[in-house]
């Protein structure tokens, strides 16, 4: 570093401490980057790359961003997965002796960003810590912007995947063992657009992790936090806490609680089910419109929007908890006038959770405090209205809601109603709040009057008509005279600067006024800054009260949203049972009915139980509505268990521990799996993890392979699921394999349903109605016609359909079903080694005549291509003659 400037030496020393970060180094009004960081940032942000002399042979690559636009540039870099260390000036350069003191004040990473501009207010921004120890995964999750902090443990990769999918963390930190746990970390990165990094081993010391948690939460034992059964989870939580301390370099005083949870406390919804049911985003466009969240979200606050997402992702499994939410919604429905008033008062409320986070971090600006104050103004009105309700959940929310009138009063007295964004420009503290501030402000105001008087006197004295007193930060106050009047300037004017069209001067009197005014301004700005920090710290000390109120507001917001949706959409309060019965009368798909106009949606019934109606085989043509019907049932069950009313005339919902769906066909390009492989992987997951209390939705199992393989797999899956000794889960099973309808009457609990279709000549009309019985046709050719397939193809398809229908496998399917009727259901189809295997045995109904026999005896290996074609032509002619 010989020959380098002291500033550049300090820059490199600082950079050495943060080698994995881009270093934003404050120099005056800019944050500058040098060397590799400059090359990276200029490319990623598309900003100009320049150079700086630093004592080396070549100029150092350099680029910079304005300090007032920091958040925007930070957000763009963090979105791309970079970490950024911010080195700030710790003293006023005017007062500094020698090199200005600078130090890193925080490190911003994808999981620790707190800027309101950078965050989606409707979503949490999670940092996840994962440790893999003794074949268990400890998981800790924190949203540093809101103070949420949760911990759990799981034993399998599948459970871990469910938790990652549930929280969709922006950043994952882990121990080295995680990379050899069997988890495909590259797939996790790509699928969730997250950053994964291993931390040094000291982050995962059991003793160190326990110590940092006890110190932060001020407890002598972690048992008091409910962490006694989470040994691996504690290590994950301690690592996350230390990482947040190291990056934020603050006390994290707004993280006041840690919540341990078991994955079994809520309905488990795996990754494919979340995707297939389109709970939070659509499968194709990845948009909110067209999802269950889109239908249910009428929340007014950011806190409520985030909580509603959590409700959808974590449906309840305890009857009392579900009924508590239902009763709250019902009472709000009955008192809709009060509900609408509450919504009006909720609407102006800002994001209290994230505001108190920024206040605790000391990053909140004056306008944040005004937003905070304006939000608090609504609380007394909401408190009064909530006092009218009597249901336990609404009473609990009323009790938790603290109007925070003392905090509101403090901000109202101290901060002006329309303050500047910057803390350093003054104009923050309201008149009458602090005596010394008022005095200095008066001196500043009078000083401007004195300047105006001086300007008038000098203009009269010199005769310079356009003489003006002006100011800038470099030269202070000065007289400005245009060149046309330069000859009239008196001798006591001292030149300060020459411009192209004017000259700038000062005088003894102007210098005296300048010292007086600027002295008052400097003192005023310093005093105002100190007073603002006092007010901010006073609010931060009330973090527990504010967070409790924020949670209450979020809960009220979600309940009023669900109530408003139930009223508008004619939803009903479902009964909840623990007997495994799902009985829905005239159920409707909550999303599809909102996407359709003029109430055209056709409602349908669903009945499933644990005995005689375990598995419904649903047949019917494509486009008839099978998938919509099955998704509709799953969504109604999920809505009921999150406590919502449901789209039906009547519903009685048995609590499900999990919902599984296998709907639709798509290759998983991210993991390199074909459609069929994806399908079989998901089926395997269902068969291994479902219980008799689960709801399973399977659509078209067995596609992507040969007809016989597909039918065999689908058949075996039906037998396995419907067998109460093996599984016995409630299931909706849509299929094009009409042969499976033969299982009704031979396997207990299996029933056939189909989509009603009306034929009009060669055309069909889908009635969208589920009726008892199996479909006798697939109507595939008619669907192709509806889709616009050319007439010539349709005509040929009809000809082939007639020919191929002769090779009917239905009769053989019926024989197998009846043969299996007296055997255990999981062995209904005889094992391959227990039967006389014949090639294409399902086609035994096709008579093995001389043509078939001759085909079987052909020695293709000894035939030339011409011989083979001649033989094929002869056999074809023989077959045609027989048909004629």
Locations of regions flagged by a protein language model:
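Charged catalytic and DNA/RNA-contacting regions of genome-maintenance
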Residues: 1-331, 347-360, 364-456, 823-830, ...
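ATPase nucleotide-binding head domains, primarily ABC-like/P-loop NTPase cores
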Residues: 35-38, 230, 300-301, 311, ...
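Active-site phosphate-binding and catalytic loops of NTP-dependent enzymes
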Residues: 87, 110-119, 251, 389-393, ...
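Conserved catalytic alpha/beta cores of large enzymes that bind or transform nucleotide phosphates
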Residues: 164, 169-177, 183, 198, ...
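Amphipathic heptad-repeat alpha-helical coiled-coil/stalk segments that mediate oligomerization
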Residues: 204-212, 219, 267-271, 283, ...
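Amphipathic alpha-helical coiled-coil segments
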Residues: 322, 329, 339-345, 372, ...
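Charged, surface-exposed helical/loop "interaction arms" that form contiguous linear patches used
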Residues: 351, 361, 365, 375-378, ...
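C-terminal tails and terminal domains of large nucleic-acid-associated
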Residues: 841-884
């Amino acid at each position: 570093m010989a020959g380098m400037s002291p500033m550049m030496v300090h820059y490199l020393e600082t950079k050495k401490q943060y080698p994995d970060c881009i270093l934003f180094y404050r120099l005056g009004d800019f944050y500058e980057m040098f060397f590799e960081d400059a090359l990276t940032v200029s490319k990623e942000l598309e900003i100009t790359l320049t150079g700086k002399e630093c004592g080396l042979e070549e100029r150092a690559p350099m680029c910079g961003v304005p300090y007032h636009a920091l958040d925007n540039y930070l957000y763009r870099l963090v979105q791309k997965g970079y970490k950024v260390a911010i080195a700030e000036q710790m003293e006023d350069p005017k007062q500094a002796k020698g090199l200005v003191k600078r130090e890193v004040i925080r490190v911003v990473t994808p999981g620790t960003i707190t800027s309101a501009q950078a965050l989606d207010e409707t979503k949490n921004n999670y940092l996840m810590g994962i440790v893999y120890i003794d074949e268990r995964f400890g998981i800790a999750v924190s949203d540093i912007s809101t103070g949420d902090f949760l911990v759990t443990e799981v034993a399998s990769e599948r459970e871990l995947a469910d938790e990652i999918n549930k929280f969709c963390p922006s950043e994952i930190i882990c121990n080295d063992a995680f990379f050899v746990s069997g988890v495909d970390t590259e797939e996790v990165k790509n699928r969730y657009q997250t950053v994964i990094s291993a931390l040094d081993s000291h982050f995962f010391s059991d003793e160190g992790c326990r110590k940092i948690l006890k110190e932060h939460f001020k407890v002598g034992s972690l048992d008091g936090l409910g962490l006694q059964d989470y040994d691996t989870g504690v290590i994950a939580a301690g690592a996350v806490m230390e990482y947040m301390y190291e990056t934020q370099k603050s006390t994290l005083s707004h993280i006041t609680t840690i919540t341990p949870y078991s994955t079994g406390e809520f309905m488990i919804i795996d990754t494919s089910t979340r995707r297939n049911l389109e709970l939070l985003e659509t499968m194709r466009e990845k948009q909110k419109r067209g999802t269950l969240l889109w239908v249910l979200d009428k929340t007014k606050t950011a806190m409520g929007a985030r909580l509603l997402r959590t409700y959808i992702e974590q449906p309840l499994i305890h009857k009392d908890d579900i009924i508590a939410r239902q009763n709250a919604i019902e009472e709000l429905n009955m008192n809709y006038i009060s509900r609408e008033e509450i919504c009006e008062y909720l609407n102006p409320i800002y994001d209290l959770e994230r505001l108190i986070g920024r206040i605790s971090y000391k990053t909140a600006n004056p306008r944040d405090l005004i937003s905070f104050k304006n939000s608090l103004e609504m609380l007394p009105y909401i408190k009064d209205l909530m006092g009218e309700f009597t249901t336990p959940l609404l009473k609990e929310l009323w009790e938790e809601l603290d109007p925070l009138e003392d905090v509101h009063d403090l901000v109202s007295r101290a901060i002006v109603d329309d303050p500047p964004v910057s803390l350093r420009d003054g104009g923050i503290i309201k008149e009458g709040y602090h005596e010394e501030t008022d005095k200095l402000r008066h001196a500043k105001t009078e000083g401007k009057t004195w300047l105006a008087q001086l300007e008038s006197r000098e203009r009269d004295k010199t005769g310079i008509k356009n003489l003006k007193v002006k100011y800038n930060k470099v030269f202070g106050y000065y007289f400005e005279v245009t060149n046309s009047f330069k000859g009239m300037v008196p001798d006591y004017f001292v030149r300060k600067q020459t411009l192209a069209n004017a000259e700038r001067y000062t005088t003894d009197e102007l210098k005296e006024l300048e010292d007086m005014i600027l002295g008052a301004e400097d003192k005023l700005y310093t005093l105002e800054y100190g007073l603002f920090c006092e007010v901010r710290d006073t609010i931060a000390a009330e973090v527990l009260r504010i967070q409790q109120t924020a949670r209450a507001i979020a809960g009220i917001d979600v309940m009023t949203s669900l109530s408003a949706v139930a009223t508008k959409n004619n939803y009903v309060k479902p009964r909840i049972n623990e007997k495994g019965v799902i009985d829905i009368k005239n159920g409707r798909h909550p999303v599809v009915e909102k996407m359709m106009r003029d109430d055209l949606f056709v409602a349908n019934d669903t009945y499933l139980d644990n005995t005689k109606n375990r598995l419904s085989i649903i047949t019917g043509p494509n486009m008839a509505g099978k998938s919509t019907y099955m998704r509709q049932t799953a969504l109604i069950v999920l809505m009921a268990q999150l406590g919502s009313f449901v789209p039906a005339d009547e519903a009685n919902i048995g609590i499900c521990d999990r919902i599984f769906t296998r709907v639709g066909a798509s290759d998983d390009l991210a993991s390199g799996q074909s459609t069929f492989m994806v399908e079989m992987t998901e089926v395997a997951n269902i068969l291994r993890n479902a219980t008799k209390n689960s709801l399973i939705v399977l659509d078209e199992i067995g596609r992507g392979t040969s007809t016989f393989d597909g039918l065999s797999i689908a058949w075996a899956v039906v037998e396995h699921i419907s067998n109460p000794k093996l599984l016995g889960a409630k299931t909706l099973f849509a299929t094009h394999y009409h042969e499976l309808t033969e299982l009704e009457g031979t396997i207990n609990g299996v029933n056939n349903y189909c989509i009603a279709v009306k034929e009009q000549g060669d055309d069909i009309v889908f009635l969208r109605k589920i009726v008892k019985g199996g479909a006798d046709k697939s109507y595939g050719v008619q669907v192709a016609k509806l889709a616009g397939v050319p007439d010539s193809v349709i005509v040929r398809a009809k000809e082939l359909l007639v020919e191929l229908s002769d090779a009917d496998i239905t009769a053989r399917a019926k024989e197998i079903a009846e043969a299996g009727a007296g055997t255990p259901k999981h062995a209904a189809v005889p094992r391959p080694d227990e039967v006389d295997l014949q090639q294409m045995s399902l086609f035994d109904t096709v008579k093995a005549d001389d043509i078939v026999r001759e085909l079987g005896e052909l020695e293709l290996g000894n035939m030339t291509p011409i011989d083979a074609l001649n033989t094929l032509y002869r056999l074809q002619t023989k077959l045609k003659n027989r048909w004629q």
